[in-house]
Curated annotation (Swiss-Prot):
Superkingdom of origin: Bacteria
Name this protein carries in UniProt: UPF0235 protein Atu2660
One cellular component term from this protein's GO annotations in UniProt: cytoplasm
Similarity remark: Belongs to the UPF0235 family.
InterPro entries: DUF167, YggU-like_sf
HAMAP family, A to Z: UPF0235 (MF_00634)
Organism listed in the record: Agrobacterium fabrum (strain C58 / ATCC 33970)
Cited Pfam families: DUF167
SMART domains linked to this entry: DUF167
Length: 112
């Protein structure tokens, strides 16, 4: 169930912590291309970023491709993005080491 969420709902995609942000992502591996496909809300009302990568879900290749994609789109080093949960699932929680107050500006780069 895909939705174009208003800006005030985008904050539901991430949680701010003292020195990082936790971002909810739904990854489609073997998706033909590396891209951010917008924001999706599941049946439970939880929002997450939709991403696809061309890499296969074997040996962590799709996860590595996701980190490369997000780092490039956000303008952050790859080392600043790590997995908190979901390394073997489509739905993932990522830790992004960046100033939580600046994250909204960075996040808007993903849509561009």
């Amino acid at each position: 169930m895909e939705h174009a969420l208003p800006d005030d709902c985008l904050s539901g995609l991430w949680r701010k912590h003292d020195d990082h942000v936790r971002l909810s992502v739904r990854l489609t591996p073997n998706g033909g291309r590396d891209a951010i496909d917008g924001v999706e809300q599941d049946a439970d009302g939880n929002a997450h970023l939709k991403a696809r990568v061309s890499a296969v879900p074997e040996g962590g290749k799709a996860n590595k491709a996701l980190i490369v994609l997000l780092a490039k789109k956000l303008g952050l080093p790859k080392s600043s993005i790590t997995f908190i949960s979901g390394e073997t699932a489509r739905k993932k929680i990522l830790r992004i080491d960046t100033d939580p107050e600046d994250f909204e500006k960075l996040f808007k780069k993903l849509a561009g």
